[in-house]
């Protein structure tokens, strides 16, 4: 536990604020999930891991968190626009299957990838198609407020009227309405809008449109922005604590969510807005047209021309956590290899720590070392409480590993520590690595079974000078990503760094 107050960077106010939940100890958090028309990629992983860390740390601080992360399975049109084809329906036509087959397949892919990345499931995972009545009711509320209009079966949000009534539109993203209007390109179908800045709440479905529902305005489907407003209101109330998502969603998606909630509920939806930054590939924005679009499955298997090897899910997770969530994260093979090495170092720290026992040796306690270890642990939590800065926490963990190594190599007896400091070191390291950062062991073999037996064979082969057998056992360990350590006090294994 930390004595530091949790501070978060609120995109809405552009500053760090002390986190004070509306109804402590309860916390409501809504995060925009994926549109499930293709395999998950690095961008999906970064957002999921970012808010998994937020979820984990809030729980560590004893908050009771209701975490809602949606699945968009209808209404998200190409180019995030109000015209064009539904992304899922388009994929379904290409593959000659039902849209919900596409939804089912890629939702399962997404869940499987997140399980591998050790991302905790949210408390609730609603789908847009499962909440059509709630969305229709919200459109009716916005129409009643005077901030929407219907035109030939479609309903649009009247951004100009909303802004003229002293409401803030563009506040989250820092955009000005006049610039939005002048900078919007003309699209087919925009003649049904009063202004190019207006956005769809409900769209009239063309006869060939697959996914459509009855509504007071005719057969149609909900606007992409409306889905999140309706679902967050249903499960978290009209105002909740945290709304999160990728920085690319800030405009128009999150900006429109705020406007919808203010129009329907007369209040802003979230107290704190958190946005994770983007991932670049060798300094370039990730995109299919650039040939640098990498799915998570390709990362796990190494099956992509840009990849020099496969990278494990924990390597991907650690790579993501090495940077603060608001920083741009640049992918490269070198960066992932370095992350893999660093992750193994953290796991070696865990293994060394688990092998230590508190000594009953009669030695003088080293007060300076006690103080130093306690300060390092405090620094770990200080990093987490400073806007979930995992980069600082990981750097502090490496400082703690250096201290653990001193005891593991028997350069000092654990008796130089107080029993309290020793136990604090063990429990804090385990809690931070496993529970807060969500890093877990990836060794496929059983350390208590096969590894122990092989180490006995290795020791015997060395004593009998059977060096071919020694080399064979070392080679097997290397294949498993492990290394054999010959030390003064005996033979042990570690993760290969």
From Swiss-Prot:
It comes from the Bacteria. ATP binds at residue 288. A motif ('HIGH' region) lies at residues 34-44. The keyword Transcription does not apply. Keywords: Aminoacyl-tRNA synthetase, ATP-binding, Cytoplasm, Ligase, Metal-binding, Nucleotide-binding, Protein biosynthesis, Zinc. A motif ('KMSKS' region) lies at residues 285-289. Pfam families: DALR_2 (PF09190), tRNA-synt_1e (PF01406). Transmembrane segments: none annotated. It catalyses: tRNA(Cys) + L-cysteine + ATP = L-cysteinyl-tRNA(Cys) + AMP + diphosphate. Binds 1 zinc ion per subunit. Belongs to the class-I aminoacyl-tRNA synthetase family. This is Cysteine--tRNA ligase. It comes from Cytophaga hutchinsonii (strain ATCC 33406 / DSM 1761 / CIP 103989 / NBRC 15051 / NCIMB 9469 / D465).
């Amino acid at each position: 536990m930390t004595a530091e107050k949790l501070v978060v960077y609120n995109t809405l106010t552009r500053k760090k604020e002390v986190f004070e939940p509306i109804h402590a100890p309860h916390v409501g958090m809504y995060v925009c999930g994926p549109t499930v028309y293709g395999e998950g990629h690095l961008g999906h992983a970064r957002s999921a891991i970012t808010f998994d860390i937020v979820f984990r740390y809030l729980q560590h601080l004893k908050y009771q968190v209701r975490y809602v992360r949606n699945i968009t399975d209808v209404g998200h049109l190409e180019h995030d626009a109000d015209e064009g084809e539904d992304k899922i329906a388009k994929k379904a036509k290409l593959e000659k299957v039902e849209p919900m087959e596409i939804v089912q397949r890629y939702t399962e892919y997404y869940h499987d990838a997140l399980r591998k990345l050790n991302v905790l499931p949210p408390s609730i995972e609603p789908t847009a198609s499962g909440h059509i009545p709630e969305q229709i009711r919200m459109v009716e509320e916005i129409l009643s407020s005077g901030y929407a209009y219907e035109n030939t079966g479609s309903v649009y949000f009247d951004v100009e009227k909303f802004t003229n009534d002293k409401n803030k539109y563009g506040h989250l993203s820092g955009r000005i309405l006049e610039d939005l209007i002048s900078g919007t390109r003309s699209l087919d179908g925009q003649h049904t809008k009063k202004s190019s800045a207006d956005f769809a709440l409900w769209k009239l479905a063309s006869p060939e449109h697959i996914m459509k529902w009855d509504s007071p305005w005719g057969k149609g489907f909900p606007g992409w922005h409306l889905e999140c407003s309706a679902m967050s209101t249903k499960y978290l109330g009209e105002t909740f604590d945290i709304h999160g998502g990728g920085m690319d969603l800030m405009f128009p998606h999150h900006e429109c969510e705020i406007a919808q909630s203010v129009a329907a509920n007369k209040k802003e939806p979230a107290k704190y807005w958190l946005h994770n930054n983007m991932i670049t590939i060798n300094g370039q924005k990730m995109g299919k047209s650039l040939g640098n679009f990498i799915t998570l499955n390709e990362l796990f298997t190494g099956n992509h021309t840009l990849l020099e090897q496969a990278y494990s899910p924990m390597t991907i997770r650690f790579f993501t956590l090495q940077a603060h969530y608001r920083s741009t994260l640049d992918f490269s093979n070198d960066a992932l290899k370095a992350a893999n090495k660093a992750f193994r170092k953290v796991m070696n720290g865990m293994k060394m720590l688990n092998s230590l026992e508190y000594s009953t040796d009669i030695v003088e306690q080293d007060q300076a070392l006690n103080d130093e270890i306690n300060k390092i642990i405090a620094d770990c939590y200080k990093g987490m409480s400073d806007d979930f800065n995992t980069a600082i926490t990981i750097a502090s963990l490496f400082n703690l590993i250096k201290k653990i190594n001193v005891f593991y190599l028997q350069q000092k007896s654990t008796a130089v520590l107080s029993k309290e400091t020793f136990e604090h070191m063990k429990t804090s390291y385990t809690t931070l690595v496993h529970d807060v950062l969500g890093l877990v062991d990836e060794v496929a073999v059983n350390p208590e079974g096969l590894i122990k037996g092989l180490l006995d064979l290795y020791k015997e082969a060395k004593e009998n000078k059977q060096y071919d057998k020694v080399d064979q056992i070392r080679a097997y360990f290397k294949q498993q990503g492990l290394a054999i350590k010959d030390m003064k006090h005996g033979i042990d294994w570690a993760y290969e760094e």
